Amino acid sequence: MPEKLAKAIANPLFPALDSLLRSGRHIASEDLDNHALLCEFEHELGMFYQRYHAELVKAPEGFFYLRPRSTSLIARSVLAEVDMLVGKVLCFLYLSPERLAHEGIFTNQELFDELLVLADEQKLMKLVTNRASGSDLDKEKLFDKVRTSLRRLKRLGMIIQVGEQGKFRISEAVFRFGADVRSNDDMKEAQLRLIRDGEAVVVHNEESSQSSFDLDENEKLSDISAEEQHELELEGDA
């Protein structure tokens, strides 16, 4: 084993970091110690994960994550459509002036209100009903789904809980939902278009305890409708 790789693996931070990466966690600069470890040993750990048919990716924004291949020994899974939509709205908010005005802190309710403003209401209602319109009860069900999505995205490292329950700060890792807009002159406007058009953006695996599926390339999820679940192949930002 190369000396520098042995040094990385021997680091007391590595076991927990390895577990986080395998669960789908994104390691951004806010996670100071783990991020510094990945920066120092990026090449060596990249070679290490190749043995598991996975790629250690450093995104243009500086955060790290694992990208399993179809033959990977590391489990892969999918995100539900509502998770994808919430992620795209988070990315939009990250790019917005409101983030600076709020010192980077948002509430669950603010995220939900922004979702209702930005997204197509008919598509939103279809996430909880088979109808294009919904009652107040349906909106409450949608809010519950949004809260569940935020908990999932928190485990993936997309948001960081702040103080009391219901407040969070958005991590740069949300750019996993904005890969298609990185090269656009107006990234905020391009992200808004993605939200309104309902276009999918590829995202890495969700934590295994949350609806985890081991997928072969192009495999279908026969027990989940196409409207409820994106059959994502988790191939990264490209």
From Swiss-Prot:
Record field: compositional bias (Basic and acidic residues): 218-238
Subcellular location: Cytoplasm, Nucleoid
InterPro entries listed in its UniProt record: MukE_C (IPR042037), MukE_N (IPR042038), Scp_MukE (IPR007385)
Principal location listed in the UniProt entry: cytoplasm
Keyword Cytoplasm in annotation: yes
GO biological process: cell division; chromosome condensation; chromosome segregation; DNA replication
NCBIfam families to which the protein is assigned, alphabetical: PRK05256.1 (NF003602)
UniProt-recorded name of the protein: Chromosome partition protein MukE
Organism this protein belongs to: Aliivibrio salmonicida (strain LFI1238)
Lineage start: Bacteria, Pseudomonadati, Pseudomonadota, Gammaproteobacteria, Vibrionales
Gene name per UniProt: mukE
